[in-house]
Amino acid sequence: AIFDSCVRYLDEDPWERLRELKKAMPKTKQQMLLRGQNLVGYKHYSDEIVSKFIEKSVLNGIDIFRIFDALNDLRNIKHSVDIVKKNGKHAQGTMAYTISPVHTVQTWVDLAKEIEDLDCDSLCIKDMSGILSPEFAYDLISKLKKEISIPIHLHTHATTGMSNLTNMRAVEAGVDNIDTSISSMSMGLSLIHI
């Protein structure tokens, strides 16, 4: 949404914004969310466009690419992962968390193994709607820590009011990183505060 907001609403160049941030914080790794073959847009793009966009992102200062497909179809993230790795940057394979009768702990573990097999540098559990329960998070992360070797990140929104406890249980299970926000921009639809 950053690229879309810059162009559509602010009449700004998103690349210029990125360069300014990198200049102001040269030692801070810059991260972006990449929707696999959708990049930062709302349709699928060709492999050539995906490659050029990632190369341009690297050139302008992105270090870590959090790559996902909304339907967890890894065919839609594979090319992005390959190009990020080819450019010497961090590819974070991401699972878009949801709840259904088929989404068991083992379903998520199997998907995480496939993500690790893509040569991702880390895994992110992306709970964009805040529906990951504390106990499911504990069970899932405990099992993932036994089954995969790459670092595990948790991104969960405060939408449902469970995220504080969910993050606490994730830490108890051994998660490597949790995403947080500064207090003035936290909670509600955002992340928990530091």
Language model: regions and residue ranges:
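Active-site mouth loops of central-metabolism enzymes
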Residues: 34-49, 68-70, 95-107, 153-161
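Glycine-rich, proline-tolerant flexible connector loops at the mouths of alpha/beta enzymes
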Residues: 1-18, 36-41, 68-76, 99, ...
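Alpha-helix-loop-beta-strand connector modules within alpha/beta enzyme cores
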Residues: 8-32, 80-93, 138-154
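Conserved small/polar residues in nucleotide/adenosyl-binding loops
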Residues: 192-194
